[in-house]
């Protein structure tokens, strides 16, 4: 038993999962299950805050690694003899790896805990990424490099699972959105930092250009190792009390793997949220893969300037996704779950319309760089806010299979990006500008099924609740969470 702070103790349950026993600590700050009722990023002595910062920094490193290749693609092309189609194939490989990794990460979090799953995944991906960077010598090696980097984004599921477990429902939307939003800035950081790091390796260290990109890749590898070790060194998984059981545990016993999986896969709301997320976060993945090349080709910008312009999209995550989480929690205070659902539909529809406009502006005969960037930033704000709004709903779907539901929803982002890439960005049927507009139209249509999501005790967009708060003892998983507890 290790003392951490006043009236706070670290306890190990029989099955080896760690949680905090708060005793009388923090009245009004934590609920009766030990979950934080508000997000205080500057309260660094609080274990909830420490976990929050570790979670987003670990995922930041994963996003940096996953999007490290596109900004230095011009330098990698001659070294690996890449054809134009190879970049698209590698992007699909990265997204496919993200899909596979996130599907696997959900049950892993439910059975092992998000902290262990996240730390191990970061270290494994760091090793695999370093090996891929060293041995890649052909287009196939480049595809393998992007695939390995894409696997690291499985940590998004662990990030959201961890936040959903240690923050109470009144703050979970904000906590999920801020942790994911700040982490997503890693993709923007890669757009800016990787070209600068590459130039430093070539100009200051005198490394040959054919080797310089491999040396540059040591940076994301080092970030993954550092954050992975930090997460594993952190001493606890969950807060104490009733919610402090090991993930996937109902009551005091651990559920079987298949029981956990069935709980999430059998809930239609998880599938609909995955579809919706596939066309908000999926749009973000597409834009972050094509934006730098779009600006280089359409506006004839140098590598560094194109990377900076493309970084504007990812940088909006610092404020837009948290804003979505804040909006989700605020509308829930006034309108309950119906408010969360309406807000998601409205914001994502606006982002889809702006995506259509980005493509139309880029297709103009004399496009304005400033105007195109401005509309792209507005599109990013709404699309990323929609992602925050989506994960303001996820924790209420199925508490006992939270990791599976998170994994299914997060995987929907990768599936949406893969399908969109195959439909609109592969081959020569559409120009990049036309493909971006088609992406927006598809997103607009795929947002409509939000209207079908219904919670038995909270209702949906058009239908009221089908059970009263007092109930009759027939409790389903969404009853485990009250919207404002």
From Swiss-Prot:
Transmembrane ranges?
56-76, 80-100, 119-139, 147-167, 177-197, 215-235, 270-290, 305-327, 341-361, 377-397, 405-425, 435-455
Q: Name one Pfam family in it.
A: MFS_1
| The keyword Glycoprotein appears for this protein | no
State the superkingdom: Eukaryota
Q: Which GO terms describe its molecular function?
A: nitrate transmembrane transporter activity
* Chief location of this protein within or outside the cell: membrane
In which tissues is this gene expressed? Answer: Expressed in the base of the lateral root primordia, root-shoot junction zone, leaves, ends of the husk and vascular tissue of the anthers.
Q: What is this protein for, i.e. what is its function? A: Involved in nitrate transport.
- Write the protein's name: Probable high-affinity nitrate transporter 2.4
In its UniProt entry, the species of origin is given as: Oryza sativa subsp. japonica
Q: What is the lineage of its organism?
A: Eukaryota, Viridiplantae, Streptophyta, Embryophyta, Tracheophyta
* Encoding gene per record: NRT2.4
């Amino acid at each position: 038993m290790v003392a951490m702070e006043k009236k706070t103790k670290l306890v190990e349950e029989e099955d080896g999962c760690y949680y905090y026993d708060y005793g009388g600590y923090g009245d009004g700050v934590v609920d009766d299950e030990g979950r934080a009722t508000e997000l205080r990023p500057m309260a660094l002595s609080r274990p909830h805050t420490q976990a929050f910062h570790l979670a987003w920094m670990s995922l930041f490193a994963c996003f940096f690694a996953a999007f490290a290749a596109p900004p230095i693609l011009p330098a990698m092309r001659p070294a690996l003899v890449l054809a134009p189609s190879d970049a698209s194939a590698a992007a699909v490989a990265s997204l496919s790896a993200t899909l596979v990794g996130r599907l696997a990460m959900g049950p892993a979090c439910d059975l092992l805990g998000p902290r262990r799953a996240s730390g191990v995944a970061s270290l494994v991906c760091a090793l695999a990424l370093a090996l891929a960077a060293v041995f890649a010598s052909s287009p196939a090696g480049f595809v393998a490099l992007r695939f390995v980097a894409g696997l690291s984004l499985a940590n998004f599921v662990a990030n959201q699972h961890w936040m959903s477990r240690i923050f109470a429902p009144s703050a979970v939307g904000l906590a999920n959105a801020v942790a994911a939003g700040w982490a997503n800035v890693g993709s923007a950081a890669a757009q800016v930092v990787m070209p600068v790091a590459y130039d430093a390796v070539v100009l200051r260290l005198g490394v040959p250009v054919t080797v310089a990109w491999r040396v540059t890749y040591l940076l994301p590898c080092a970030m993954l190792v550092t954050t992975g070790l930090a997460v594993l060194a952190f001493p606890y998984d969950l807060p104490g009390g009733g919610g402090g059981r090991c993930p996937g545990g109902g009551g005091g016993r651990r559920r079987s793997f298949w029981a956990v999986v069935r709980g999430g896969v059998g809930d239609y709301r998880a599938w609909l949220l995955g579809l919706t997320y596939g066309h908000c976060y999926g749009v973000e993945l597409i834009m972050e893969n094509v934006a730098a090349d779009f600006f280089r080709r359409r506006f004839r910008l140098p590598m560094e300037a194109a990377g900076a312009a493309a970084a504007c999209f990812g940088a909006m995550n610092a404020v837009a996704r948290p804003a979505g989480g804040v909006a989700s929690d605020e509308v829930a205070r006034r309108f309950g779950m119906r408010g969360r659902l309406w807000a998601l539909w409205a914001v994502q529809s606006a982002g889809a319309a702006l995506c259509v406009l980005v493509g139309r502006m880029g297709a103009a005969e004399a496009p304005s760089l400033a105007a195109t960037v401005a509309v792209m930033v507005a599109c990013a704000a709404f699309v990323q806010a929609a992602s925050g709004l989506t994960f303001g709903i996820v924790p209420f779907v199925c508490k006992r299979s939270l990791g599976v539901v998170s994994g299914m929803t997060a995987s929907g982002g990768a599936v949406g990006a893969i399908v969109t890439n195959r439909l609109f960005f592969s081959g020569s049927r559409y120009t990049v500008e036309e493909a971006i507009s088609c992406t927006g139209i598809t997103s607009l249509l795929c947002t409509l099924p939000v209207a079908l999501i219904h919670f038995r005790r909270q209702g949906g967009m058009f239908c009221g609740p089908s059970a009263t708060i007092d109930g009759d003892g027939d409790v389903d998983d969404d009853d485990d969470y009250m919207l404002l507890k």
